[in-house]
Amino acid sequence: MSREPCALAKGTRRSNATILQQEEITSSPSNPPGTTRRDVLKTLGTAGALGSATALTACSTTVNVSASPTTRATPFQIAATTSPIVGSNEVFPVRRIYCIGRNYAAHAREMGSDPTREPPFFFQKPTDAIQFVPPGQTVDHPYPPLTKNYHYEIELVAALKSGGRNIAMADALSHVYGYALGLDMTRRDLQRAMGDEKKPWEIGKSFDRSAPIGPIHRVGQTGHFSKGRIQLLVNGNVKQNADLNQMIWNVAEQISKLSEAFELMAGDIIYSGTPENVGPVVRGDLMTGKLEGLPDLNVKVV
């Protein structure tokens, strides 16, 4: 435990600038009533006033300077975001959710972009956007507020066990812990409105339960996904139908490019982009995501 340099008046920040203010310090034999910090500075000099324990012995507030912020008590608890791991009692702790935009050429074109010219771009969702979908079950997914054009986007999700900066593409897949199937749900009208106004469009992408996801399968169980049929059905009708080998940027390239902008870490997950034919759903619709090698993802809009 350590005493603070002085007893500050309520609302005053402690710094080399504010220590010059005129608030009185607690009286003591060395600091009679009415003594201010400026008086102490005149007597001892600035360095002495800042560093002398003798001149300010009467200050009584104490702080624990050795305690790590991570070990201190908090006023409330925040639940961690996790996703179950197939074949394990452990769960995967989600640190960040990265998403790549327009990563299939046909989808890029349907969104008004030229995939032959544009580099990859990424955005994020909050970790609590995760909505877990157990295999073999259908999960109710609430239709979100503020939208009249709610879209599905089926995607392969890569989960990282390690990370770093400027990861070489040749090393990128060694950082992958496993894979899952997910939906990047989108309030398309809000996204487009923000885009038209040149504003960030998180309101269209980064909202509650906007990231339904199945359980994570470890690489040892599935291998890496460089190809495979990926589909999204609505009420049994195929809406999206493509192959993972049609990605503009594969998973290894995505990891490498992302690490140029962010320090990737264990717990990060990457939604790897959606094929063409995204479209709207309404309450009562059943979405079924399919990917060869992973269980179906069944989500009902309510």
Predicted feature locations:
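Hydrophobic, well-structured mid-protein blocks that either form specific transmembrane helices
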Residues: 166-202
